[in-house]
Regions:
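Conserved acid/base catalytic micro-environments in cytosolic active-site loops
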Residues: 3-7, 11, 24-32, 44, ...
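Extreme N-terminal starter segment of soluble prokaryotic enzymes
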Residues: 13-16
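Conserved acidic carboxylate
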Residues: 21
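A generic structural motif
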Residues: 37-42, 58, 209-212
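Acidic, metal-coordinating helix/loop segments flanking the phosphotransfer/catalytic sites
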Residues: 44-62
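Negatively charged
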Residues: 65
C-alpha cells in the first residue's frame, strides 16, 4: 500500500526521497539507511502505480525505484513519471546481466542513474553499500532532468530508438574526418552519472576514422559487458569490454571493465595494449584518471581526452596529465550535462582546450589538431 511517511531523522531535511519497492522489508531497509544518513524519506510505494500517486502528493527531490514489481513495474513507472511529475529517479537494479539490460532501458526512458544491489535482493549487501547508496541519491538530486530525458524526447519525436535520437548530431563525414587526422588517433573518454546515454550518443555520431578508443564509465562489473555490446551495436566501431592484455587498433574501442582499472600499457605501430589492475587507492573503480594518466605516459601519437557528464572529480587529474603531454582535451558543456561535476572539475584544472555541447563532441574529437 502506498503511504507518505515522516522519517526525517533530524539532521538534514533539505533532501526528500520516495522509496519504491515491492518488498516491504527492502522498503524499510532502504528508508532506514537513508534516514540514518539524514535524508528525509517522505513516502513509500509497493509498485509503479502507487509510486505515481505518492510522488504527485509529496513532490520529492528523488525517487528510488525498484525494477521488477507486480502490476506497473519500474520501467513503465519511470516513463509515466517523466510525463506526469518529472522527478529524478535512481533505479535499484539486480547485480546481474539481466539487471543490466533492464537498467539501460530505464536510463533510456529517463532515469538518471542506477544503484546496483549486491546479490540482487540480499539485504546485507545493500547495508554494506549504504554510503554508496546515499551518495548516489544525493548525486541524482542534482541532476538536470532536461538533459537526462533528452534522448527519450528526441527518440519519441523521431519515432525510433536511441540511434534515431542521435541522428541529429552534426558530425563530419568519415572521409573528412580521416583527412583531419595526423596519424592514428587515440581517444580516452571518461563519464559517470548520465554517461551511458551520453557515451552512446557520442559513439553513434563518431564517423569511421583511424581512431582507437578507451571508454571509462563508472559502472559495476556485471554491467560493463552489456554496455560494450550496446556501443558496438550503436556505433561504427568494434567495441568490447577490456580484458587483461587486450589490444586494439584502428576502428576499435574498449570499455573499461567494472571493478578494475584499465591502464594503457604499450603503444606500438598504431596499436595499444591495456592491462587491468585492482588498485584501491582511487575513489571510484574504474577510474578515468588511471586510464588518462597512462595514456599521457605511453601514447606518443595524436591523443584526445574527453570528459563527459558525471558526479565528482574523476578525470580532472587525468585530463591535466593529458594536456601536459600535448593531447587535445574536451569537456562537455554544463547546459548538456545531466550532472556538471566531472567536466567542471576538469575545466577548473586549466587543462581543457574546448568545451562542447554533447552533439558537438564527436566532431571535436576528429575535427581538431592532435
Amino acid at each position: 500500500m502506498s503511504r507518505t511517511t515522516d522519517r526525517r531523522g533530524g539532521r538534514d531535511d533539505s533532501l526528500q526521497v520516495v522509496v519504491v519497492d515491492d518488498s516491504p522489508f527492502m522498503r524499510g531497509l532502504i528508508s532506514d539507511l537513508l534516514t540514518d544518513a539524514g535524508v528525509a524519506v517522505v513516502g513509500e510505494a509497493g509498485d509503479g502505480a502507487e509510486a505515481l500517486s505518492v510522488v504527485a502528493e509529496t513532490r520529492p527531490d528523488v525517487v528510488t525505484m525498484d525494477v521488477e514489481m507486480p502490476g506497473m513495474g519500474g520501467l513503465e513507472a519511470v516513463e509515466r513519471l517523466m510525463d506526469e511529475t518529472p522527478t529524478p529517479v535512481l533505479m535499484l537494479s539486480a547485480h546481474t546481466a539481466e539487471g543490466a539490460e533492464v537498467t539501460f532501458e530505464a536510463l533510456e526512458r529517463g532515469a538518471v542513474d542506477f544503484f546496483s544491489k549486491p546479490g540482487g535482493e540480499v539485504s546485507a549487501g545493500v547495508s554494506r553499500e549504504s554510503d554508496r547508496l546515499v551518495e548516489a541519491v544525493r548525486s541524482v538530486a542534482g541532476a538536470d532532468l532536461a538533459a537526462a530525458t533528452r534522448d527519450r524526447r528526441e527518440r519519441d519525436a523521431a519515432g525510433g530508438g536511441p540511434s534515431a535520437a542521435a541522428s541529429g548530431a552534426s558530425t563530419p563525414s568519415a572521409s573528412a574526418a580521416s583527412a583531419d587526422l595526423d596519424g592514428p588517433l587515440t581517444v580516452v573518454i571518461g563519464a559517470s552519472t548520465g554517461g551511458p546515454n551520453a557515451v552512446e550518443r557520442v559513439m553513434s555520431a563518431l564517423p569511421t576514422a583511424d581512431c582507437r578508443i578507451v571508454i571509462v564509465q563508472h559502472m559495476p562489473e556485471a554491467f560493463t559487458p552489456r554496455f560494450a555490446d550496446r556501443l558496438d551495436e550503436a556505433s561504427a566501431y568494434d567495441v568490447r569490454e577490456a580484458s587483461d592484455g587486450a589490444r586494439i587498433g584502428s576502428g576499435e574501442a574498449l570499455v573499461a571493465r567494472g571493478g578494475s582499472h584499465t591502464r594503457i600499457d604499450s603503444y606500438r605501430s598504431g596499436r595499444l595494449r591495456v592491462n587491468l589492475d585492482e588498485d584501491d587507492s582511487q575513489s571510484v573503480t574504474p577510474a578515468a584518471d588511471v586510464t588518462m594518466r597512462s595514456a599521457a605516459e605511453v601514447v606518443d601519437g595524436p591523443l584526445v581526452g574527453v570528459v563527459l557528464t558525471g558526479m565528482g572529480s574523476d578525470a580532472s587529474e587525468g585530463i591535466r596529465a593529458m594536456a601536459d603531454a600535448g593531447a587535445r582535451t574536451i569537456a562537455q558543456s554544463e547546459d548538456t550535462c545531466v550532472i556538471y561535476g566531472m567536466p567542471k572539475r576538469a575545466v577548473e584544472t586549466g587543462g581543457v582546450d574546448e568545451v562542447c555541447d554533447l552533439d558537438d563532441v564527436a566532431g571535436a574529437i576528429v575535427g581538431g589538431e592532435a
